[in-house]
Structure formats: structure tokens, C-alpha cells
Amino acid sequence: MSTEQTTKTPRVVIITGISGAGRRTAAHAVEDLGWYVVDNLPPAMLGALVDEIAANNIDRLAVVLDVRSRIMFDALGVAVNALDERGIDPAIVFLEASDETIVRRQESSRRPLPLQQGGHLLDAVALERRMLSDLRAEADLVIDTTSITARQLAQRIDHAFAEGIDEGLAFQVMSFGFKRGVPIDADLVFDVRFLPNPYWVPELRPKTGLSSDVASYVMAQAGATEFIDRVEQLLGGMAPGYLREGKKQVTVAVGCTGGKHRSTAISEELSTRLAARGHRTAVLHRDLGKE
């Protein structure tokens, strides 16, 4: 009788991005989901680590990589190609944030950026963006952490990985306020400012789109149901194409003026509709509570 033990092929996620964008916060979120997490691994060691993980029958591996030099970027490409040849398709998650956000976070931590070397902080940020532009273009998932909290980042990571990044197309529906800018990581953006604003209804003004009163008001407006019907059909029709192109997650942003009433209510309804179609969905209200 054979005593050979069957090993699992692990799912591999690579977490990288701009310094100060939240790589370690993302790693902690994944670790809380039961992933085996390794921080600051040189790219050249990725293959050996996967072998060790597989030998110990660990099926989910998340690796935080710091790729700021051409040599390390090339080494990552070699490592990823080697895994592809073995039937392991690692997912790359790239985190970024605005210059202002990174400066604020770095000043709060009182730690210089790795590329700063005594120079100006913004120059170091710009250099890092240029060095990582190719990697960002190849990422399976790009998350802009500028306007989201650590908790919201964890929720997005949870949505991407809790059910497995390779198990069909997932939709992230995000409400936002145009006055705070359009989410730069959105794949599709819809504007619901054509609907009457509950802000001008005194009894609804202090409430949010999560309130049944506000949601009922928004959905009762002319064009609201038709809008959601059409967006639902559009996304349902696009889903097979996204999957054929290898896209694992689509971020749909729905905006109103402040992100408190209309976009929140519409995002909740759209997320419910997509879930009823069998898609993995999550809803994030980026600007709720910031008014």
C-alpha cells in the first residue's frame, strides 16, 4: 500500500503596491480569513515558499512583496511565470493612494519612504509610482485606499478572497459623493444625480440611504427602477466577457452629490439585484458619515 501523501495546489495571492497604501493592513485582513501570510519576501524565493506551503498541505498563501527595483520586478516576473507553468495562477493585488494621503500617513508614522533617502517625500512617491507602473498594469485587483478606512479595506479584501478570487465574477458596488471625487479604482461609474435629492426633504435630511424611509423615497422617483433595471441587465450581459478576459472582480461606483442618500440607496438595491442573479457581491459606502 502506497504511503505517498497527496498535496494540494495552493492558491497564491501577491499583495504589493505603493508604500503607505496599506499593504500590511491588507495582509492582516487576509490573515484573519485563515490565509498563511508571509511579509517582505524577496520575489526570487516565491517558488521555494510555494513548494514548502504545498508540502504542508496549506492551500491559501498570501505574500506581501516590496518590488521597488528593476531587478526585483524582473525576479517577480520570472517567479510568476514559473508558477504559471506549474498550473498555479497567482493573483496580484495592488494598493495605491493619493499623494496627499501617503504624505499624511508617512508623517504620522514618522518613517521615511524607502526611496526617500533624505530627499523630498513627494519626489520619492513619484519615483515609486513610475517604478511600479508596469506591475500595477498587470494586477488582478487595484484598490485605492485614499478615502477608505482600514476596516473598509479589510471588507474589500474579505470580499475578494473569502469565497476565492477564482470562483466566478464578483461585483463590488461602491456609493460615493462627487464632491469628494470619483473613485479612481472604479471599473464603471454611474451618476444618479438625475434623481430628486432627499436632502431637501426636512424629515429625510438627517437620515441616510440605508434608512427604509430614504430608500423608499429614492426608489419611488421617476426613472429610479428603470435605471437599476438597465444597469442590472448591462452588468449581467458584461459578466461573461469579463470572465473570458480573466477579470475576477468588477467595481461599480454609483455617485450622487454627497454620497449620503441617493447613491447609497441605489447601491444597496443594485447589490441585492446582482446577488439574486448568483453573483458574489459586496457593497461599500465610501463617503457615508463624512458629511
UniProtKB/Swiss-Prot annotation:
One of its GO terms (molecular function) is GTP binding. Disulfide bonds: none annotated. Gene3D superfamilies: P-loop containing nucleotide triphosphate hydrolases. GTP binds at residues 66-69. It comes from the Bacteria. ATP binds at residues 17-24. This is Nucleotide-binding protein PPA0813. It comes from Cutibacterium acnes (strain DSM 16379 / KPA171202) (Propionibacterium acnes).
